[in-house]
């Protein structure tokens, strides 16, 4: 009788329409219920309704009220958490194929089918790529997925690499090379093979793309400065613009440096052989002559030439550093000419470091963390590697060469790929001003600092550098780390703009064309100017792809490292090991710290810091945790921690602070 009653249907619709409707993101818990997080409020989702949604789904919901209790009833899917995703294969008790999503907050198995293109016979625990095909809120059917790609077996020791590369849709293979390579640049090159160029790299480096030569400039038998000659490998001599290799490099943008091995941007026979500046082999190069005074100031316009060069020695960072630091039983240069080059480069570098202190910015010394791996990918140890003097020699030569390239491209080509950074995000300039005043101002300097750290001043390169020089001598990293959150991201641009992070008016990299596509583009522009050939302005799609590829590569490196840290630290839980750590972030849920010995990221749950949640407050302006009204922990603090748990499935390392 009531079945098709239009009045009843209308009444139901009116009741439904009168209910509050909200949009939000689903958050699951380790129980059957969940929550809907909306802009201003969080609503409970009951267990039966949670079966229709997944953690991370953006949905529309109606709010059901029972007395003073409210709960969200999912209505429609706005954006699913899952489209393409990484998963592990499982078979249920009826031997039906399912997938387990590789995500710390999603633990429900999803029914799946294997695409015909996937030929492997799937086994329990295999890693795969899947796509979500049906969703209960969208398709009126249960969750269901298709497996589109096999990644590797469950017991593959290299799973951290293969799974992470698949997650970020990056190839694990080098670019396919050509059958043979011909020199396309038949233009005249200067013969600079007589100059005593040297390369300085890691012992294991195969893709040497920079070589250095230096000599003093003298007037009336008195040294007045330096002439530095920077030779950079020239892969564009072999790569046609319309070639498949060019298209691949344009897509990859960078060589991917991963723990244990790299995946080159160019075919290995180019990156490691034909273009690499191997000792005693003649190679095509783009060369820049740079002149400075003894204080490191550039005194002449840079002079670029196409040339042939021949490195006379392949030197290693650690050996050169040991030699210059006069370590016991240190390596010695093989020839007096090489020794002379090392000493001159050392003197030049000291002058340039001093120049930075006055005219631009130097970075605070932080180590790189290197994984030492066995053949099978097992982590044997993790080394903290500090930048030593030989690293600084190469770094300073590359920085000055890139300053010169920016100047040349800006003046001669009016375009290029420039590395830029505009300092504080405009929307955070006020915050940065107030933070600096709160931490550095007192009664005596209040007026002076109000001017010095005014919003207008902090927005200029000079004002920003002045502020950085002010905080440089301060022992703690607190100011540095807090201010970092107010900064904008570095960007690639096609026109000259300052790089606040380096403290420079302009910066354009061209010194790593084997490893960076942006440097290949700048090579072509410099060579076109030299040859008086036409060229085009750098396209926005190239800049956008560079930006995205840089972000992807950093995520790949971080994700693999997180996984390897878990494998390395898991056996140490039973040993109750202790570490010194730096607080990196402060959240409601706890602290994120970095272990100083090996670089691993550890989570400290708030429940281990204090037993009364009501007495804990996070101050998001200071990035600090207050307990009973006292500031107890802040970003940059050094704390002693104990390792308590490692969960490899979610790549999480948990610890507690030792009071």
Swiss-Prot record:
Domain RNB intervals: 189-531
GO MF terms, alphabetically ordered: exoribonuclease II activity; RNA binding
One Pfam assignment: RNB
Cited PROSITE patterns: RIBONUCLEASE_II, S1
Domain S1 motif: 576-658
NCBIfam families to which the protein is assigned, alphabetical: 3_prime_RNase, PRK05054.1, RNase_B
The name this protein goes by in its record: Exoribonuclease 2
Source species of the chain: Haemophilus influenzae (strain 86-028NP)
Gene expressing this chain: rnb
């Amino acid at each position: 009788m009531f079945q098709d009653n239009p009045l009843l249907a209308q009444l139901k619709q009116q009741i439904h329409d009168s209910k509050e409707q909200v949009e939000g993101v689903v958050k699951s818990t380790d129980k059957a219920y969940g929550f809907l997080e909306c802009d201003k409020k969080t609503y409970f989702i009951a267990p039966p309704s949670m079966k229709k949604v997944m953690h991370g789904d953006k949905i529309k919901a109606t709010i059901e009220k029972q007395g003073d209790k409210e709960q969200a009833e999912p209505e429609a899917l706005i954006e699913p958490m899952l489209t393409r995703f990484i998963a592990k294969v499982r078979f249920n008790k009826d031997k039906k194929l399912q997938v387990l999503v590789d995500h710390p907050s999603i633990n429900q198995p999803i029914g799946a089918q294997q695409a015909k293109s996937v030929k492997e016979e799937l086994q329990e625990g295999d890693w795969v790529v899947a796509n979500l095909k049906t969703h209960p809120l969208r398709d009126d059917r249960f969750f269901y997925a298709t497996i589109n790609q096999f990644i590797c077996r469950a017991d593959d020791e290299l799973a951290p690499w293969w799974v992470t590369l698949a997650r970020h849709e990056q190839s694990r293979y080098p670019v396919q090379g050509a059958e043979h390579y011909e020199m396309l640049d038949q233009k005249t090159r200067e013969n600079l093979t007589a100059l005593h160029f040297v390369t300085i790299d890691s012992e294991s480096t195969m893709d040497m793309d920079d070589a250095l030569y230096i000599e003093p400039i003298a007037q009336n038998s008195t040294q007045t400065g330096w002439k530095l000659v920077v030779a950079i490998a020239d892969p564009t001599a072999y790569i046609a613009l319309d070639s498949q290799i060019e298209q691949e490099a344009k897509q990859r943008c960078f060589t991917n440096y991963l723990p244990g091995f790299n995946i080159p941007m160019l075919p290995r026979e180019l990156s490691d052989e034909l273009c690499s500046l191997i000792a005693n082999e003649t190679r095509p190069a783009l060369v820049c002559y740079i002149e400075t005074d003894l204080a490191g100031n550039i005194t002449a316009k840079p002079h670029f030439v196409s040339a042939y060069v021949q490195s006379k020695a392949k030197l290693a960072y650690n050996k050169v550093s040991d030699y210059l630091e006069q370590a016991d039983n240190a390596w010695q240069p093989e020839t007096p000419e090489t020794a002379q080059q090392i000493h001159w480069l050392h003197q030049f570098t000291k002058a340039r470091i001093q120049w930075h202190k006055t005219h631009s910015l130097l970075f605070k010394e932080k180590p790189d963390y290197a994984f030492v791996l066995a053949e099978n990918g097992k982590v044997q140890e993790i080394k903290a590697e500090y930048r030593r003097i030989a690293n600084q020699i190469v770094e300073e030569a590359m920085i000055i060469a890139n300053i010169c390239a920016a100047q040349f491209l800006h003046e001669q080509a009016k375009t290029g790929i420039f590395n830029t950074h505009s300092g504080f995000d405009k929307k955070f300039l006020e915050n940065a001003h107030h933070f600096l005043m709160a931490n550095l101002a007192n009664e005596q300097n209040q007026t002076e600092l109000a001017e010095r750290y005014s919003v207008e001043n902090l927005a200029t390169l000079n004002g920003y550098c002045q502020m950085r020089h002010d905080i440089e001598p301060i022992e703690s990293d607190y100011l540095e780390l807090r201010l970092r959150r107010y900064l904008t991201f570095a960007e690639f641009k096609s026109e000259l703009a300052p790089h606040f992070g380096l403290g420079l008016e302009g910066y354009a990299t061209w010194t790593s064309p084997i490893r960076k596509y942006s440097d290949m583009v700048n090579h072509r522009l410099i060579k076109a100017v030299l040859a008086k050939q036409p060229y085009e302005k750098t396209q926005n799609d190239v800049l956008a792809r560079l930006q995205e590829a840089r972000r992807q590569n950093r995520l790949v490196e971080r994700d693999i490292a997180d996984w390897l840290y878990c494998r390395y630290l898991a056996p140490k839980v039973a040993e109750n090991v202790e570490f010194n750590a730096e607080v990196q972030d402060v959240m409601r849920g706890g602290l994120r710290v970095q272990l100083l010995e090996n670089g691993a990221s550890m989570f400290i749950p708030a429940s281990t810091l204090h037993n009364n949640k009501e007495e804990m407050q996070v101050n998001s302006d200071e990035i600090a945790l207050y307990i009973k009204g006292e500031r107890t922990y802040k970003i940059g603090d050094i704390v002693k921690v104990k390792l308590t748990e490692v969960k490899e499935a979610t790549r999480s390392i948990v610890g507690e602070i030792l009071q």
